[in-house]
Amino acid sequence: MNDTPDMQSFYCAIGLGNPKSPSNVGSVVRACGCFSADHIFYTGSRYDRAEPFYTDTANQRNEIPLTHIDSLTEAPVKPEVKIISVELCENAVPLTDYRHPEQALYLFGPEDYSLSQETINKSDDVVFIPTTGCLNLSATVNLLLYDRMIKQTKVLSHIEANDLIRSSRDCRNNLIVKD
């Protein structure tokens, strides 16, 4: 019997609570493209006002839906999707110890505030990234998505890793580690 989950069973979405900075949202969109997230939801009106200044240098926005919703905990996802809040919250699980569900909606508070207690209460899990001080929103999303990827991906062979590197790097990068 094969215990490896079918990649089709994986779903990953990001929920941003009233994001303020278009550059942060642009960085989140790029991270979602790099780490194969499926959807980005956001609440509030600040991003809509800032959207003309949006930065997405990798054009990931055409690949990943970015949808305004009224409430993060009521995002239109399947019932089996777990809601995971990522917040500096007492009694939260350190990300280093967390086992990600196959299907998850990860919620992040705004750059200048936190998720609400109501959102925390409605979450299936709450995790935090052990740091001294708080991280930037896009840095937090990047770390979370990287952690999810490394914990759910099989170890790549050397050949597979090189194929991934070739398909991911900038066209001017032809670097090789010499034996």
Language model feature labels by segment:
Residues C34, T119-E160:
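Structured adenosyl-cofactor binding patch, chiefly the S-adenosyl-L-methionine
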Residues M1-E87, M149-K154, H158-D179:
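RNA substrate-binding interface of SAM-dependent RNA methyltransferases
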Residues V25-G26, E51-F53, P94-T96, S116-T119, ...:
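Short glycine-/acidic-enriched loop or helix-start segments at secondary-structure transitions
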Residues V28-R30, Y54-T57, D97-P101, I120-S123, ...:
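Short, glycine/charged-enriched secondary-structure capping and boundary segments
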Residues S71-P76, N91-A92, C134-N136:
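A short acidic, often aromatic-flanked loop/helix-cap motif at beta-alpha or helix-coil junctions
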Residues S45-Y47, L72, P110-Y113, P130-L135:
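Short, acidic/turn-prone active-site loops that include or flank metal/cofactor-
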Residues C89-K122, V126-V127:
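Active-site/ligand-binding-proximal alpha/beta "capping" segment
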